[in-house]
Amino acid sequence: MDFRENSRLGVVGEEKHLHDGVLQIFWQQVLHHSPEEMRMACFFDSSIPWQMSVYHSMKWVPHIWSESGEVRFLAGDKEAAAEILPDLTRELSAQKEQVSFLIFLLDPMLILGEVLQSLLQEGKADRVMVVGIAGKEQELPKEYRSRMIWQKDRQELQLYEKDKRITVPVQYD
């Protein structure tokens, strides 16, 4: 999947499918990009077991650390989010075009408001990709134009290619 064309991706499905979909995207990007090319952040709910499982996978990779290596961009509650947001915002606003950011918003309540809106808006030279989740497609904000639908009765990937929506039926195991 090309995140340059599909930089706002919503993963829709039941908890098991959300877990698998998020980790699939995460590992694909980790294996294809060095930490110098792509950094990652994750905002999750530490009270939800599957999201803690995602956290335990993410915490080991160097892509999660700030450029200085002092901050791990993982937040499972409001206090942790408040601690990492200044460093993350600073790195996002730096004009280092060679570094992209992939942000997993498993719990968008941790960064509501202006920061969330700025993350969800796409820019021309967008180096910020966002992955969000929802149990149902209607629950996704409109900014998530591309969707990975992972439900019992409907399994498809909806992507945009040059402003044209392409729907690809897929079989998730």
Predicted regions and their residues:
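Accessory regions of macromolecular translocation/handling assemblies
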Residues: 1-173
